[in-house]
Amino acid sequence: MSAHKNVEKVIYPTLYKREVANRAKKYFKGGNGALVGIEIKGGVEAGKKFIDSLKLLYHVANIGDARSLAIHPATTTHSQLTEKELLAAGVTPGYVRLSVGIEHPDDIIADLKQALETSGNVKLKAVS
C-alpha cells in the first residue's frame, strides 16, 4: 500500500524507524497484529470516498472482528473535535483505520486497491 500513488503513509509497527520496529518485534512475538493505519492523500473527502468505495470491508467503529473493518475517524469517532484537536490526537484528515479479518488476502487487497483508486478521483473545490 505504501507505494500506491494515493497513499501518503502506512502506519504499522514494523514499518517505522529501526528503534520502533525493533521494539515491535521484541514485544509482538507472534507478529504485529491485524490493525493498520493509512493516510490517504486528498484529506477528508478522499478518506470518506475511500470508505464509501469499499465493497468487502465493513464500515464500523469496532475492531477485532473476524470480518475486515474500516473507519475514517475524522468523520466518525472523532468528528466532534476541531482540526487542531484532531491533529493533536494523531488523526489526520485522510487517516483511515483498518482491522484485517479472515477473508482471503487477495479479496482484501483487491478491495483496498479499488477503493484507493476511487479515492484519488476526488475533485477539490475552490474556496473563495
Put a short name on every predicted segment:
Residues 1-55, 61-67, 81-87, 114, ...:
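Conserved small-domain helix->loop->beta segment predominantly found in fold-type I
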Residues 52-53, 68-128:
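PLP-dependent enzyme catalytic core of the Aspartate aminotransferase-like
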Residues 58-60, 106-107:
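Short amphipathic alpha-helical segments with coiled-coil-like heptad repeat character
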